[in-house]
Amino acid sequence: MIQGIGVDIVDIARMQQRIDAASGFRELVFSPAEITYCESKANKYESYAARFAAKEAFLKAVGIGIDFSIDLNQIEITNNKAGKPYFVYTKQVEALLLTHIGFVPDAQVSLSHSREQAIAFVLFNKN
């Protein structure tokens, strides 16, 4: 049974500005594995923007929003061998989810981008 859905769209040029500003934004928002993945891509800013959109869409789907006490770099988006993205949560995130919504969601995520924008759609079920 579907428990939550979320969607978010991110302007890629704005994401590039935030990452290039050298303010530590990249490390605050993305895990080391995500940074390695995005930096390996020819169009790295599209990958960063899509992952950022996924994190915001996830928080919307769960109903806790971006201002909740979850560090975004603790929610990781990685890919399986076929390239399908999926979420990996730290124990800290799992504990916060258990406290806030009573379970750790089995979230599905879809990412896409054009030259200007990235979008993510998240749907989750209760395990």
Swiss-Prot record:
Its cofactor is Mg(2+). Transmembrane segments: none annotated. It catalyses: apo-[ACP] + CoA = holo-[ACP] + adenosine 3',5'-bisphosphate + H(+). Its EC number is 2.7.8.7. InterPro entries: 4-PPantetheinyl_Trfase_dom, 4-PPantetheinyl_Trfase_dom_sf, ACPS, Ppantetheine-prot_Trfase_dom. GO terms for molecular function: holo-[acyl-carrier-protein] synthase activity; magnesium ion binding. Keywords: Cytoplasm, Fatty acid biosynthesis, Fatty acid metabolism, Lipid biosynthesis, Lipid metabolism, Magnesium, Metal-binding, Transferase. GO terms for biological process: fatty acid biosynthetic process. Mg(2+) binds at residues 8, 56. One of its GO terms (cellular component) is cytoplasm. It is found in: Cytoplasm. NCBIfam families: acpS, pantethn_trn. Transfers the 4'-phosphopantetheine moiety from coenzyme A to a Ser of acyl-carrier-protein. This is Holo-[acyl-carrier-protein] synthase. It comes from Cytophaga hutchinsonii (strain ATCC 33406 / DSM 1761 / CIP 103989 / NBRC 15051 / NCIMB 9469 / D465). The lineage of its organism: Bacteria, Pseudomonadati, Bacteroidota, Cytophagia, Cytophagales. The gene is acpS.
